[in-house]
UniProtKB/Swiss-Prot annotation:
Protein family (similarity comment): Belongs to the universal ribosomal protein uS15 family.
Lineage: Bacteria, Bacillati, Mycoplasmatota, Mycoplasmoidales, Metamycoplasmataceae
Molecular function, one GO term: rRNA binding
Gene of this entry: rpsO
CDD domains with a match to the protein in the record: Ribosomal_S15p_S13e
InterPro entries: Ribosomal_uS15, Ribosomal_uS15_bac-type, uS15_NS1_RNA-bd_sf
Family annotation (HAMAP family): Ribosomal_uS15_B
Record flagged with keyword Repressor: no
The protein's name in its UniProt record: Small ribosomal subunit protein uS15
Taxonomic source organism: Metamycoplasma arthritidis (strain 158L3-1)
Keyword Ribosomal protein attributed: yes
PANTHER family tied to this protein: RIBOSOMAL PROTEIN S15, BACTERIAL AND ORGANELLAR, SMALL RIBOSOMAL SUBUNIT PROTEIN US15M
Length: 88
């Protein structure tokens, strides 16, 4: 579970202003944080297949957002993946 404070920090870091939650890098950063949180959950609960479905949905949503960002603004895409450390 990602705290409200952590989400606010991500919005400030990746958004254009403090309330810019719709900006693609902000959405990707929040999804990445939720994915990392779920990874820790699955280390302790290997058989939780119900949550795995939601996890896979989040990963696929992030993948689609990254693809859209890559096609629309490649420089911002590179900055985002570097800041979040999600790809090589």
């Amino acid at each position: 579970m990602v705290s409200k404070q952590k989400i606010e920090e991500l919005v400030k870091k990746f958004g254009r202003n403090a309330k810019d939650t719709g900006h693609l890098p902000v959405q990707i950063a929040i999804l990445t944080e939720k994915i990392e949180s779920l990874k820790k959950h699955f280390e302790a609960n290997k058989k939780d297949l119900h949550s795995m479905r939601g996890f896979i949905a989040k990963v696929n949503h992030r993948k689609a957002l990254l693809s859209h960002l890559k096609s629309s603004n490649y420089e911002l895409y590179l900055e985002t993946i570097k800041a979040l450390n999600i790809r090589k």
